[in-house]
Amino acid sequence: TLNISVKKTISLATKGMRIDGRKALEFRKIEIETGISKNAEGSARVRVGQTEVVAGVKMDVGEPYPDSPDAGNLIVSLELTPLSSSRYDLGPPGIGAIEIARLVDRAVRESKLIDIKKLCIKEGEKVWNVYIDIYSINDAGNVLDAAAIAAVAALQTAFMPKYDEKKEKVDYHERSDKKVPLNDLPVMITFHKIGNTIMID
């Protein structure tokens, strides 16, 4: 049987309303702060309503994948920390965190946000790896959209570290004036259909 809060949510949804007072298509308040980490190539803190996440971008040089010898690599990871909710445990990322990271990875990758061809240093040998690490600080719902927004904001402010081709070494103490090559910025929106009502999360 449905619990009382679920029944109330469904009842309000049929009227285009919800428990927190927002209308069906009304977003949570979104706040974005960038440049929160001195050690990351780019970083952001995002609040979507009471949900808060932080994201950082780090880069290093590695080998390309065999099926894309002239393109850089993207790796997204996410941790749902016990700090953010009692539902989460210490230890390796759980299924929920892995799934959210996979969805953010797909959103960034399939939207063509990063021009990965411009991350190639030497075809078939060396490319830039772009790591996006995301951590939940408070989970009050819709961590997925908050994580996606934080990832995009961190990428948008990221500058590439310098790479010494002779020494084949990245100099993390000095930033170049090159930003991570980006295309048009994607926007991730989660919505649900409850009865006949479409609701923004």
Regions found by a protein language model. Give the residues of each.
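Polyanion-binding surfaces on beta-sheet-dominated domains and ring/shell assemblies
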Residues: T1-D201
